[in-house]
Amino acid sequence: DGKDLAGKNNAEVSQMLRGQAGTSFKLKVNRPNAKGGNTPMEFTIVRESIQNPAIPYAAVLDNQVGYINLSTFSGNPSKEFKKAFLDLKKQGATSLVIDLRGNGGGLLDEAVEIANYFLPRGKIKQASNTYKTLREPLDLDIPIAVLVNSGTASASEILSGSLQDLDRAVIVGSRTFGKGLVQVPRSLPYGGTMKVTTSKYYIPSGRCVQAID
């Protein structure tokens, strides 16, 4: 749109290209040609909403080990997970690694839904509410290992902790983040906002996943 991008860094260029989905901008580039010069070219780019997949990678590794990298619990990752898992089983996977490293959480219901795939009908607790695994599981016997690290938080800790507490998976990695509280924003006078802790997450053994300073 007539703005020069020369000399700008990636963050500055990215900021200039962002906009509402459905809007467009003109991008003019100089493409090197066979004569040693540049050929100016102009493109009209239409912006679209970008949604990163909840499962950026899934594959059958050596020794028939299925691997699923689950990056978020936002959106509808349980459907993506189910499809990926069933595809791995068709490819011959006899064990499963669920990679939750760097997964900061998302929707608790999605974590319960994925736990449902590997647990008999039971309970996962959250404060005074009870979340039940209601559907028939996909596989009660496949060996599972869950990878975690300091970036594993919230719904990720609920899933990994529940699978561990119910003797359904082995947890491998470092200490997780410890995000076990629920905050609700409250409006304050003069436009301020305060987050108030209203509840805690508990996994089946009764442990709260919140870190203690």
Protein language model annotation of sequence segments:
Residues G2-P189:
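Cleft-lining beta-strand/loop regions that shape enzyme active-site pockets
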Residues Y190-S199:
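Short acidic, Pro/Gly- and aromatic-enriched capping/linker segments at domain boundaries
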Residues S205-D213:
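Conserved functional hotspot residues or short segments at active or partner-binding sites
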